[in-house]
């Protein structure tokens, strides 16, 4: 009795077929897993653990969590606009932006932090601009709906003008077998010159009014809105195709495609990842520099006021807390019982509970002690991910290397690299805490000598 099916066939990133369906009669499933299935190459359902995996992190970056989606997207939009303004104003005000790119001095204290901030900001500057601006474009209609309201009486009229009129046909109540999907996919692929099928949408399956819409995969095309061919769901014959994109729709499609990066091959995906990591370092080093520079200007740097202390605590919660939550999320995926009720929700809750725990720890501990403690915790958690993965599954790093499964190899190696980076940060923070009292005691002697 499903109203529609959504089918994603196997591709270079997945060996299984993903199937989702919309229940009929307005029914709403209690959980997402109740309206989805994973099929192997023979069409049999594969039993998988209940998880939202990386899809949650993808949705979290613009939908947040524990709050209505609409308000979350407004908050994300405000933050993205501030970021875009900060990047543009930074380019204008930073006179030595390209000169500083070649200045990276190690072991120079605050100077090294500033160099790291400048280098990570400049080296991926085109990416920072692109990802921020295109992120705003993806939700531009939500943030600026007035153009549509001023020119179209109804939103549906606008959608028909831009995307083409698509009439939803109600069920006739007359049963009819669905056409074989294999020949339909082959026909669509041939229409696109051999390009791969991205996904299929079947409306009114099992009814005489059934329709099959086949959308092209984004491979080889930056635009996010692939071409579409529609077939009669009973006869399997083509009955229509998507209209040619106008300039505005084509531009929007490219902007969203650049932001999502689904068109990218592995090399470009790694560049996206490393650029994003550089942006994270840029923000993190900026947060640390802000407190370091302002501490020296306080009346009594050893006893900062409440506002300054709060910023330090929030920095620890952000720089150490969120990565700790991510690592805990990965560990929960492997350690929670497979038959646990609402398992996917417990995985997500583990992320936020860990993040909260780090924040509470930062509140009750002196910042100088909390920094090495929490950075060390993050290092341990990330290092534990590949170890737990090896002991709880057949996808451990040695097994993945022998099998040539570079997707799992890359993931485990990235976890170990992050662990090493946070361990280095914990060591630096601990050494700085030990050296600080010595420096304080030495200053009066230096003053007397002078």
Where in the sequence are the language-model features?
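Extended, hydrophilic extramembrane loops/domains of integral membrane proteins
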Residues: 23-62, 219-256, 281-288
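Hydrophobic transmembrane alpha-helix segments characteristic of membrane transport
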Residues: 53-56, 89-112, 234-259, 295
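Alpha-helical transmembrane segments forming the membrane-embedded cores
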Residues: 127, 132-174, 303-433
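Internal alpha-helical transmembrane segments
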Residues: 70-155
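Short, highly charged, low-complexity non-transmembrane loops/tails of multi-pass membrane proteins
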Residues: 429-450
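Non-transmembrane, extracytosolic/lumenal segments of membrane-associated proteins
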Residues: 1-29, 145-223
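Long, internal scaffold/assembly segments composed of regular secondary structure
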Residues: 177-274, 279-281
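Membrane-water interface of transmembrane alpha-helices
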Residues: 87-100, 278-298
């Amino acid at each position: 009795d499903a109203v529609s099916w959504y089918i994603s066939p196997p591709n270079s990133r997945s060996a299984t077929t993903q199937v989702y369906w919309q229940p009929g009669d307005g029914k709403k499933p209690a959980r997402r897993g109740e309206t989805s299935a994973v099929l192997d190459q023979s069409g049999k359902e594969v039993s998988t653990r209940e998880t939202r995996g990386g899809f949650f992190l993808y949705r979290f970056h613009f939908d947040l969590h524990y709050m209505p989606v609409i308000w979350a997207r407004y908050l994300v939009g405000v933050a993205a606009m501030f970021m875009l303004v900060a990047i543009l104003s930074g380019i204008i005000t930073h006179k030595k932006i390209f000169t500083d790119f070649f200045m990276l001095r190690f072991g120079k204290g605050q100077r090294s932090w500033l160099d790291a901030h400048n280098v990570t900001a400049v080296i991926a500057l085109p990416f920072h601009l692109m990802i921020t601006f295109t992120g705003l474009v993806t939700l531009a209609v939500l943030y600026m709906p007035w153009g549509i309201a001023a020119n179209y009486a109804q939103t549906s009229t606008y959608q028909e003008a831009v995307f083409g009129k698509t009439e939803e046909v109600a069920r006739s109540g007359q049963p009819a077998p669905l056409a074989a999907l294999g020949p339909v996919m082959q026909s669509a692929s041939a229409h696109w010159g051999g390009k791969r099928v991205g996904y299929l949408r079947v409306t009114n399956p099992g009814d005489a009014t059934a329709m099959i819409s086949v959308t092209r995969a984004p491979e080889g095309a930056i635009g996010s809105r692939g071409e579409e061919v529609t077939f009669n769901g009973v006869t399997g014959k083509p009955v229509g195709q998507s209209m040619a994109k106008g300039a505005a729709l084509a531009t929007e499609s490219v902007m969203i495609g650049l932001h999502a990066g689904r068109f990218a091959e592995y090399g470009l995906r790694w560049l996206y990842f490393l650029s994003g990591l550089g942006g994270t370092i840029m923000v993190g080093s900026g947060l640390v520099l802000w407190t370091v520079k302002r501490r020296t200007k306080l009346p009594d740097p050893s006893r900062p006021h409440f506002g300054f202390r709060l910023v330090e605590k929030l920095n620890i919660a952000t720089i150490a807390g969120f990565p700790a939550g991510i690592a805990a999320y990965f560990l929960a995926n492997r350690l929670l019982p497979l038959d646990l009720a609402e398992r996917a929700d417990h995985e997500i809750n583990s992320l936020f509970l860990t993040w909260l725990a780090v924040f509470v720890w930062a509140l009750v501990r002196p910042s100088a002690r909390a920094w090495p403690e929490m950075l060390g915790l993050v290092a341990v958690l990330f290092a534990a991910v590949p170890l737990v993965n090896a002991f709880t599954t057949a996808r451990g790093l040695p097994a993945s290397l022998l099998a040539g499964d570079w997707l799992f190899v890359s993931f485990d190696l990235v976890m170990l690299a992050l662990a090493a980076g946070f361990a280095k940060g914990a060591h630096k923070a601990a050494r700085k805490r030990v050296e600080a009292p010595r420096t304080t005691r030495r200053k009066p002697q230096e003053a007397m000598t002078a």
